[in-house]
Amino acid sequence: MIYNFIDSLIEGKFQKRLNRFVCNVEVNGESRLCHVPNSGRMKELLLPETPVLLQKKQGKQRKTDFDLALVLYEGHWVSVDSRLPNKLFEILVKKSLLPETSVAYGAEFLRREPSYGRGRFDMELMSTNSDRILIELKSVTLVQNNLALFPDAPTDRGRRHLEELTDSLREGYQPAVIFLVQRDDALCFAPNWEMDEAFSKALVQAQEQGVAVESYAFKVTPEGLNYCQRLPVTTQREVE
């Protein structure tokens, strides 16, 4: 296990999503407010009466008692926390768990959230050749027929990230976009052409220009997450 939940998760049932970041869950027979740490649609996951696991959270500024952590889908636990991939990939780098074919293999971790252009990326690394690597991480929860797909909702922000990663090539950076699949039933990753053609085209163009595109899947349990495998990436419109 490379990532463990600090406290035991609490069982519940999903009831209804109220907005992007708040839902109702049933805990011990009572309806409670719960924070949804993911702005994606997740329509195939968040169905009434679906078993979920929650993290108990406290704070004076909080309006909810829990964070939604895991959702059970067709016998597989799915981690829906979009903040988690940053922690997961940092662990993969620092513990040298990435395969030799990864752009970040053997790289040194430099810092989180480096500034670039009009915004920030998720992290910056230094390769064994002293090249600066800019990393943008994407959380993936959607899998159809063993194919992991991103995004599950249109994302102008995601498209801009790809364009800025491509721009960084001219300044000598080695940029990469990494799709972390927080479930273990995917065998391949692809952009979601049907949901967001503009993002998908931008991903193809970025890869053609030299942006590294990688994807990794994780085994999810009520105790935590473990690295599962690197997934092949296809950018074709249709996958046979």
Curated annotation (Swiss-Prot):
For molecular function, the Gene Ontology terms on record are: DNA binding
Enumerate the InterPro entries for this protein: SfsA, SfsA_C, SfsA_N
Tell me the first and last residues of the signal peptide: none
- Top-level taxon of origin: Bacteria
The cross-references to Pfam families, in alphabetical order and at most eight, read: SfsA, SfsA_N
Q: What does the similarity note say?
A: Belongs to the SfsA family.
Q: Which PANTHER family match?
A: SUGAR FERMENTATION STIMULATION PROTEIN A (PTHR30545:SF2)
- The protein, known as: Sugar fermentation stimulation protein homolog
- Please name the source species: Natranaerobius thermophilus (strain ATCC BAA-1301 / DSM 18059 / JW/NM-WN-LF)
